Amino acid sequence: MNKTRTVKINMLFIGVVIVFFCFIIIKLSYVSLSNVVNKKDLKAFASSRNTAKETLIASRGSIYDKTGEILARNVNSYTVIAYLEPTRTTDNSNPQHVVDKELTASTLSPLINMTKEKIMEMLKSSAYQVELGPGGRGITELLKEEIESKDLPGISFTKSIKRYYPKSDFLSYTLGYAKTDEKTEIDGEMGIELFYNDKLSGTNGYKEYQQDMFGYQIASTKPIIKKAIDGNNIYLTIDTNIQMFVEQEMEFLERTKMDWANITVMNAKTGEILGSASSPSFNPNTKNISSYYDPFVSFTYEPGSTMKMFSFLAAMENKLYDGKELYTSGSIKIDKYTIEDWNKKGWGDITYDEGFAGSSNVAAAKLSQKLGKEKLREFYEKLGFGYKTGITLPNEQEGNISFKYEVETANAAFGQGLTITPVQMMQAASCIANDGDVIKPYIVDKITDDKGKVIFTGKKEILNKAASKENTDYMKRLMKTVVDGSVKTAYAMNYNVPEFDLIGKTGTAEIAGTTGSYLTGTYNYIRSFTGMFPGNNPEIIFYIVVSKPTNLTAVPTVTKSLVKSIGTYLNLNSSSTKNTPDKKVLSYINKETNWVKEELINKELNPIIIGNGDKIIQQYPNKGAVLNKNDKVFLLTSSSEYKYIDILSWSKKDVSSLFKLMDMTYEEEGYGYVTSYSYKLDDVINKEDKIKIIYKPLYEIKKESTN
């Protein structure tokens, strides 16, 4: 009985074992054939554990001015590292850690703009290594090399990529800035960098490969690579020389106490923005930003009497204007409100033409009564007020022209009770400069892909026909009387620049306070000037607006200086002092150096001879250029070697011309005129040399020379 029971148990055990092994065999067969266990693909799981994938970061595109001068680009960036652990040093003759903390701190302090005490505090850390920030973060290659030349034991660097703006605080709000995120990608945060972030960023690629247990690529395997597509390059309509003039005038305004300001210059014929600066500004390399909004497109304000250009023009277009008609100036009562001229006593009975020259609020108010709110608003809308212009800059505002009652309409006729932006003023003024055509402002000249192919071209865009040539010509004559003193009521003769035939209109606007009433006091106004020149056929439109300036002559001072700088640069002088044909540049290629030098001196031009060769092989400017007296002509000779020359006090334009002719790159800082450079005079030029040039505004140079 027991024996039989034992046999049954054994057979049962054997059966269980057989079933178990059958199950295992079936399971293994299933796994080997399907690669799936518990709904998990084992093949994919194993592959993922052995496969590494690296992101290939696309290089961000650069931003240039219209001529190809670089305004924003990627550069190698370095962070200063101090190794503190003594065990890093295995050979005392070649220490690999910081040995002399005192010497290291005192040497680095002026170089990375940190106090010696702060650096000493960091060097006394018990850590293996420390990062010397903030001053030692994001330094340039030039500064890295200067630190390396000090041979400080234990000082090293980590490398990264950062966005660099070679001109520092220059066109800052337009360019904006971009910063590196935690994934080492660079993203735009303001300005063009933000608006065109997708186009500048490009498309990242990747590298996928099989790795061993230590994370290294297995040599016998072939990686899968999808190359990154670098970002597009953006060329702005900005003329760097005109931008420099604008920046210099903004520097002057900033030395006076004010709230904010904007100066913008536009090509009257095309709508290209040639220069624009706002204050308070910032350096996009250091991001010392007090406001993230650009006044040019984002600030709305009541503009004041510059709007009389458009309310008077509206009356002309509606056949309601007779410039010789008399009216009583001084004040007018509308409903229960009294509107006064700035000259509260008025000028007596004067014509409407005289009222425009004197910036009479009463004249504008009476014209608004003839027009009515609908016709005035309709004309303002034709010019683009109340709508975004669509310029390709972020955070553009549309302003407000929702006047309703008769007194509000009167206020709107002289620029109160409605709000605009500077870019809207530029667009509206284009109507007067272009025989009634409203031209859309634009700031991007072209966009190229990573291969240099042009994929977008900016162009002139006529939005509508808002006025007739007859009426805009009339308005230009009125704007001339504002500044030339030819009419008894004119008061803005301190704006007059007769050699460039400037015309324009002043503006003084009250500022609304937080309580709803207007601010009081001598300086609580927005002062502005809309100008264009030459008056009979404008090439340039500009707008200067300053909030709460304490220097009441600042706007006319800046206006005259800006017009003279731009007019001379663009050769728009309307007087007899214009360049004559003997200032025209010829082709000097293959001519004898001495003969060319004498020829240019006789033309009262300034030859800059590069090298000691007896023949000219390259020149700039090229044949046909018309120059002003004492302008430089750069001549590259047939020399076996070239030596550095003195460029102190040169303008950025001249420096750029020289280095372009030499086919060399350089780093620059600041703007204005050259005050120092990194090379030694008469050293032989090596195209691989790293050159740095420092500029300062003229007023700073003059101030330093008198100290």
Model segments located where?
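Extracytoplasmic
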Residues: 56-59, 66, 75-77, 152, ...
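Beta-lactam-recognizing serine transpeptidase/beta-lactamase-like catalytic domain environment
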Residues: 72, 212-223, 261-304, 310-544
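Short, well-structured beta-strand/strand-turn elements
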Residues: 75, 154-158, 256, 324-325, ...
